[in-house]
Amino acid sequence: WVREADVDGYRCDVAGLVPTDFWDEARPALDALKPVFMLAEWDELYPSGGLTWEEFNSETQLLERAFNMTFGLRLHYLLDHLAEGKAQLADIDEYLAAERAKYPPSVYLMHFTSNHDVNSWDGTEYERLGPLALPFAVLTALLPGMPLLYSGQEAALNKRLAFFERDPIDWQDFPLQDFYTKLFQLKKRHPALRNGDPGSRFQRLAGPAGLYGFVREKNGSAVVVLINATAEPLELPGQKTAINPQKGLFDVFSGEQLTLAQAKARTVPAHGYRVLRTRD
């Protein structure tokens, strides 16, 4: 596949059920042909492959030598539980702490609101997350990690695709193309959002229980992310942040230019989000 099709990476199914020694030997053999990106369908923080907690091995060490990234299944299921009212936004902090306790800052996981398994077997993001589908898309893209966009999400796909048969996607007029373009351009271009960068700071913002806010900052450039999981508008937290008050802010989705004081005076809409970045 590397020699003839020039593939640049592999997504390896239930990688943790294969002996890690195999992957550790396979990776340098592939890299000798061409540097590849290796993604493991596995999460060392959450049971994968249909295993129970008792059967699960969290010490597969797939990210030591063989793989660049694993799935972030623990966060995925946490977001589902949040939408169901079975978890609190503060539980995200516990997840991030567990991730950092296990891995150095250079390691990052893949986060998502849908993928081929989830869409077909568990339901679309609109079935599972309801009005939080887009706020949680913002969250999975801008928390530390690598975001995944599944087929049809930019077209607001709202049906379960057949798993083993051809099932064409109705692309419509790509209603969410602008949303995902702005989101991923920010992710790609902003220095504070780079994957596995130990120089990027993460600051959690205090606020009401239904608001999850954080700042990511590097060398004076910052991104503010605010997620409102409630049915009521919420005010922005007023605490001191890493943002230089002399710098103006740019609302990534509305295009507004604001002062820090103006930004703090705004609310986050019900089941909504706001993403601000410092102006250059």
Model segments located where?
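Solvent-exposed beta-hairpin/edge-strand motifs
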Residues: 240-255
